[in-house]
Amino acid sequence: MKTKAPMKNIRNFSIIAHIDHGKSTLADCLISECNAISNREMKSQVMDTMDIEKERGITIKAQSVRLNYTFKGEDYVLNLIDTPGHVDFSYEVSRSLCSCEGALLVVDATQGVEAQTIANTYIALDNHLEILPVINKIDLPNANVLEVKQDIEDTIGIDCSNANEVSAKAKLGIKDLLEKIITTIPAPSGDPNAPLKALIYDSWFDNYLGALALVRIMDGSINTEQEILVMGTGKKHGVLGLYYPNPLKKIPTKSLECGEIGIVSLGLKSVTDIAVGDTLTDAKNPTSKPIEGFMPAKPFVFAGLYPIETDRFEDLREALLKLQLNDCALNFEPESSVALGFGFRVGFLGLLHMEVIKERLEREFGLNLIATAPTVVYEVHLTDNSIKYVQNPSELPPENHIACIKEPFVRATIITPSEFLGNLMQLLNNKRGIQEKMEYLNQSRVMLTYSLPSNEIVMDFYDKLKSCTKGYASFDYEPIENREAHLVKLDVRVAGDVVDALSIIIDKNKAYEKGRALVETMKELIPRQLFEVAIQASVGNKIIARETIKSVGKNVTAKCYGGDITRKRKLLEKQKEGKKRMKAIGKVELPQEAFLAILKID
């Protein structure tokens, strides 16, 4: 490890890109060019440390790496902060960008600007970052560099006449890019002699060192002899260790200077003690006020998670607590369901976040889980003028107690090739969307801005968007406000009992259609019983759809050979009596597929 560089030779930058535009590959190239990792240890997507990240080709957890580079005889330190590209993880992007002075805006030369790129670039511009446009994948035969440059200028308004053209796969233009980073991105500003002020922009749990904070030193410096005050909690802790970030191993250091990025170990048991966005300062000589402008991540989607083996409830709690150590956006509370037993109501940032958490619980902790239909938080105004916030359909008060229900809306930005515009607008209308703006970016691409109910996008909107545009559309959203809506609770009754885990809150006009589809699907999935089973969809006390599963008949007259008909009739009557009694007391076991099917029904 080379000696520390002066503050004027430090560059802190991040990479903004949409999924699949080559961000992790470009990060690999920069790491390789600066020899931060030996060729023997280098592997693709080195910044993506989770198996799920590599398999899905996405970045979930923002990583950082310290690179050394010599330019014109001077040693520079380049701190690269890798950011996720998916809409669910935009909170990771915003906090990573707060610790940088510049950002590389990476755009695929074959695809042009996408919705998520625009959203993250605006976050960077709000933080006054220097933006360097980078056109990636220029070696592909269908690359259209000039059109993409024009696209960036028209959509975002950044001058692209000197944009760097690179191919991360073929390692073209990487040296020029590194030199451009040094000459264009400003050095960090801050006062090295002021009291310590460090921004926590990420935290995670290490099995050996406890909760670790990834920090950017804004003012002053930190060393291993110091006592640190966490300003959010008001607690003081000794510094157990300081490290420079590297994807393969942490590099120990005795101090972190102003403008640097590093890892601080305070020997804490949980990341809740070092919340992201909090400020670290010197306990003996504290800074006057913490760093402003950080908001905790708020869950957007809620779902129930239940273990299939009911005795593994405590294992699920342990697993969620462990994941929460690394994921400050994950929150959960216990809940119980008549149909599914004990489980947890879990809050997620979005559907991908929910999928990733469920997959990690199953893969890393060996749990088998049932997830209920995802919901959002509704604002329910009651007739006694009070307001109740409901995230679980079973908590919705009776209809005669409700004055009105308000549901959260989002503003969605969608960029699509113009040939799919008709299909897309039809989908948005089906999802109760309200068009706000439509603008042609060029002859072949359109940007649509719609306001949509959050409830409509948490189910299957993303999949439907991709299928109706053959995968070419990109989508981003931001929450706006709660608006009044005509919503009802749709219940599913099996053999007369309400299955609370299958209840959903839905637009009144869609209730019949959804109810019919639900009971038809359930009829296919529930095995036949020894008694007749009625499956009903109801709104309040009104049954709106019904299907019946016929009973399995046992041939009770098989042993009668000819003889008197009254003997057979007596046996059949006895069987009918038994079935009637069974129907009154019998319970129907619902297969897991029934709960999964509700997510798939349009």
Swiss-Prot record:
GO terms for molecular function: GTP binding; GTPase activity; ribosome binding; translation elongation factor activity. It holds the Pfam family GTP_EFTU_D2. It is found in: Cell inner membrane. Its EC number is 3.6.5.n1. It catalyses: GTP + H2O = GDP + phosphate + H(+). Keywords: Cell inner membrane, Cell membrane, GTP-binding, Hydrolase, Membrane, Nucleotide-binding, Protein biosynthesis. It comes from the Bacteria. GTP binds at residues 20-25, 136-139. Gene3D superfamilies: 3.30.70.240, Elongation factor 4, C-terminal domain (3.30.70.2570), Elongation Factor G (Translational Gtpase), domain 3 (3.30.70.870), P-loop containing nucleotide triphosphate hydrolases (3.40.50.300), Translation factors (2.40.30.10). Residues 8-189 form the tr-type G domain. NCBIfam families: lepA (TIGR01393), small_GTP (TIGR00231). Belongs to the TRAFAC class translation factor GTPase superfamily. Classic translation factor GTPase family. LepA subfamily. This is Elongation factor 4.
